[in-house]
Amino acid sequence: RNLFDKDHFSFSRVNWMTNIVDDMSYNFINFDRGQYGVNVLFFNYGEQNESDEFGIIQSQFTPLSAVYGFSYARKVNKYNLGLDVKLITHNLHTQNAKGLVFGVGGYFPKVYKDLDLDVMVRNFGFAPKFGSWKSELPTSVNVAGTYPYKEWMFFGQLNRMKKHQTFGMGTSYNYKNMLWGKAGYYIDDMHKLTYPTFGLDFKYDKYIVGMSYIYGDKTLPLGNTIRLTINLEL
């Protein structure tokens, strides 16, 4: 569960696939106020080489993608329902594309004792189109559950897509509402991705600084990925 109950601002930075390249990264900025939220993600694919038909490098370019998001949520009886809208833009040197995708979901507390349930349908709508080629959206149905026990929180999430599914599970430990230790495991059989994750959040005054880490050797593209997040309660 989110550590913030109030309006907040957050910034995340990730160097992506560092086992393969050293200049691919993304930045994520999020602002939540009341029932509304806005966010933006900038993805930098790193410097690429442009070559001619003989393989001779002519120039370099840097493809970029951005996702601009808006969310709205409201409480209906004891449940929370939400809507998510995202504008996707791609600038891939010689090709540009835009898309508009949506997501709807609900949070259902205490469906069985202290078990909370989240259900969401994500990434459906209008896929980005590059010339005459239309990309395919990763539309998914996500079902997640969380269960608290004393200072512990246990969670799991199943993501069902058109051709495959992924699953993640984990636990977190709350130490005096100032330090949270986290550990999890992710499974994607189709893409042969299975790895453990670890995280640590530290709260001071209105700030929460978080760091997460994907463990893996050099055969795992996402291995040794570190995400740093800074949250500010407003």
PLM ranges: what are they?
Residues R1-L234:
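Subset of outer-membrane beta-barrel
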